[in-house]
Amino acid sequence: MTESLRLPAASLKPSTVALPGSKSISNRTLLLAALSDNACEIHSLLKSDDTDRMLEALDKLGVEIEYLAEDRLKVHGTGGRFPNRTADLFLGNAGTAFRPLTAALAVLGGDYRLHGVARMHERPIGDLADALRIAGADVEYLGKEHYPPLHIGERQDNGERVIPIKGNVSSQFLTALLMALPLTGQAFEIRMVGELISKPYIDITLKLMAQFGVQVINEGYRVFKIPADAHYHAPEHLHVEGDASSASYFLAAGLIAATPVRVTGIGANSIQGDVAFACELEKIGADVVWGENFVEVSRPKERAVRAFDLDANHIPDAAMTLAIVALATGQTCTLRNIGSWRVKETDRIAAMANELRKLGAKVAEEAEAIHITPPETPTPDAVIDTYDDHRMAMCFSLVSLLDVPVVINDPKCTHKTFPTYFDVFSSLTETAE
């Protein structure tokens, strides 16, 4: 039987939340450290299902990892060559592990099988596989064409140095290729075919690669040039920023409840694009204060939360939180350019529409957009299905701040990125029940 969690109608206390480490940074950092020619001590690493899958894979590939504390470990780099050239890797539903490992292993070559949960086998990877094959990689589909599971064999250097890749389904494909090609020691040029979505995630990749000694030339997000003789050299210590996507729930809570909420672990100089979520809240009624290591959101009670019509391509994960904020506006709100939601942990446009309707909202879906007209009062005790999607669970917790109780099915799906989320959320709230 599915476990559920009832959140009573609640008010928010003025609060400060220490964010868990960023998933995007944690998994990129683990792989780059493993491929470096020296050791790297990583601090504030996210402890979650997705990072566990990456750590398990690196262990199977022969990477030496010392666990120094719960959120601190030392990765001993392999010099860009994994010791184990044969492995069977289960990667769950962790796209930030599956895509970059696919590219790294395909470029290095070996005898590898990569697979995951059923949903991972429904998430496309064909655009990445096509690009890797142009670079001489041996990538074979073991099930449906263009989808995992995959077998990876030996790469044959065919001399091709210009690699086209599509970026309109997932920016993780480009991230994976960028991180992998320096392992060849050859100069490469990656050329985008069509639109590149979620550019801020590419910025994270490029900034982290630079911290590990590889400078990529970015020509307007159309062409990326990787220098010859590149190799990864890790910083001795690296501190992982807090997760800006996870920050969105607490910052939105401050706006909805008109109560100051501060998150620590990110700030004005964060390398994560999702910090722009706070700027979007400011446009619709929030007061935002930025520090070097914090962001704080509040709202005067007399100021209404304004409706919005937003192109959310730059903040695809955090934009989900705005779908719940829409319920506090009293007017129709629209999120556009969110086609990537369709191929995430679930079809997030369909899932969000289904669950918002349970609350009494009128919702219209398009291929890459969602229009939300809130009810006067959300339906109390609506039972929200979460589709094994951590962000669905965390988003809908905010409904309890709209003066109605809500029931969240499978709350433990948050273990993917934020295992303690509901404990933290409950500690910030007061209930009348």
Swiss-Prot record:
Keywords associated with the record: Amino-acid biosynthesis, Aromatic amino acid biosynthesis, Cytoplasm, Transferase
Pfam families hit by this protein: EPSP_synthase
Main location group: cytoplasm
Catalytic activity: 3-phosphoshikimate + phosphoenolpyruvate = 5-O-(1-carboxyvinyl)-3-phosphoshikimate + phosphate
Pathway: Metabolic intermediate biosynthesis; chorismate biosynthesis; chorismate from D-erythrose 4-phosphate and phosphoenolpyruvate: step 6/7
CDD domains from the UniProt entry: EPSP_synthase
Residues that bind 3-phosphoshikimate: K23, S24, R28, S170, S171, Q172, S198, D317, K344
Residues that, per the record, bind phosphoenolpyruvate: K23, G95, R123, Q172, R348, R391, K416
Location in the cell: Cytoplasm
Similarity-based family: Belongs to the EPSP synthase family.
Function: Catalyzes the transfer of the enolpyruvyl moiety of phosphoenolpyruvate (PEP) to the 5-hydroxyl of shikimate-3-phosphate (S3P) to produce enolpyruvyl shikimate-3-phosphate and inorganic phosphate.
Protein name: 3-phosphoshikimate 1-carboxyvinyltransferase
Gene source species: Neisseria meningitidis serogroup A / serotype 4A (strain DSM 15465 / Z2491)
